Amino acid sequence: MSNHIFTGSGVALITPMKSDGSVNYDVLGDLVEFHVQNGTDAIIVCGTTGEAATLSEKEHCETISFVAEKTNGRIPVIAGTGSNDTSTAVMLSKSAASTGVDALLCVTPYYNKTSQQGLVRHFNVVADSVDIPIILYNVPSRTGCNIKPKTYQELCKHPNIVAAKEASGDISQVALIRSLCGDNLDIYSGNDDQTVPFMSLGALGVISVFANICPKEMHDICQLCLDNDFAEAQKLNFHYLELMLSLIHI
């Protein structure tokens, strides 16, 4: 697969709020400009860090539309549209696709303890509903559900399922996914601290929390990996490792 959604550092963008709990679009617009100007390679809106699980459907759709319009094609925008309810995931995905975003990020159904075959059916229904690329999002520590490597192998047969954000924390699983899926499925690290080892296995970058505050630094780490300078990338990774890990617990 020659066309990638992005390579490098994609920020898992926060969703700023006003004191009354509404989305602060003025600050959100400033954040988009901050990332465009400071080396971020893609913006992921309404993901876990963007509090997708606690936004209303209206807020969710409006936030995606705002970020897509504000970014205006300067860097890729990826919209989080996953849900534990297939029909809601389809609705959010169709709404996001209509705004002109470049791709969708779809988390595994949470709480339901879906079977592996259930995952295949769920994601294929979502992928059938749109005409843009989908990044699967595997974060079993939050969802209670892990996409197994052979399930990835089945899922990437769908032409719209082209990538995965792997936040399982299991480097052996990532190696097996790469072995089974090869170039049919792009991999992005879902954990900042594991970006370098994941990229040494062929991942294309990271969907990053750390990039919210250090966009250039995360971009530089990824670029060094893409340039096969893993020794220098690891030096930078070690330098920022404590900060990266602290952000997991905020």
Predicted features, each with a name:
Residues 248-250:
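Conserved small/polar residues in nucleotide/adenosyl-binding loops
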Residues 3-11, 17-144:
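Active-site beta->alpha loop and helix N-cap motifs at the rims of alpha/beta catalytic domains
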Residues 1, 35, 96, 153-156, ...:
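Structural motif
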Residues 142-244:
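Catalytic alpha/beta core domains of metabolic enzymes, predominantly
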